[in-house]
Amino acid sequence: YRQASIKAYEIDYSDAQPYLDIAYKDVKEAFDFYMENYNDGRPVVLAGFSQGADMVLRLTKDYYNSEGAYGDVLVASYVIGWRVTQEDLDEAPYMSMAYSAEDIGSIISFNTEDPSVTQSVIVPEDVYSYSINPLSWSTDTQPVSQDQNEGACFTDYSGAITKEIPAFTGAYIDPVRGTLKVTDVDPQEYPPGLDIFESGVYHLYDYQFFYRNLQENVGQRVESFITIHSGGAVG
């Protein structure tokens, strides 16, 4: 799709909307084409990262607000690496945040950062972003130890896993920001990678730090969906 460039995140978010709207137009048209021509009523998992997660959130808003749309086949929306605010939920009152490992039709979201971080491009200061802890699949603020981390996986540009580290880090949800704070990561070892992020913003690692937990969870939610809906193929 015609992805908005990194420059779109260096200006006010409202000013960036025309560029993001172009990106979303492509994503929505592609999704509609798939649903109308290939889906055949099978359950769907939506997943995105960063701008892609913003696109997934927009899709979820549209189809939960549209009568007769595809909400009945949505297993879950993984909005990883983008904020989900109360304003977002108010715009689409049928949307809900995930609260466990198996609830369906819900949004799974988190933004990973060091405990010292107080603001980022993704979650600005004084903004609360709803999250779930991928180590416990709970929305409370209790710290979860690294032994609950099934494995961080790091990949090359082809997507191939080049390194896996079991029990990589623990994490907790920040009660003020709603972000996911990691407890066992050295910012010097995992730099932000982009100039728009300060040290300790682990945006680029959101999926990687919790890879195996996320992988397992997709299966859990699909199984839950199929059980509730009395069987069916997965697409």
Roles of regions detected by a PLM:
Residues 47-56:
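Gly/Ala-rich beta-loop-alpha elbow adjacent to hydrolase catalytic centers
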Residues 26-40, 61-224, 228-233:
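Surface cap/lid and interfacial helix-loop subdomains adjacent to catalytic sites
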Residues 9-21, 200-204:
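Second-shell loop/turn segments in exported
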Residues 1-8:
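Active-site machinery of serine-nucleophile hydrolases
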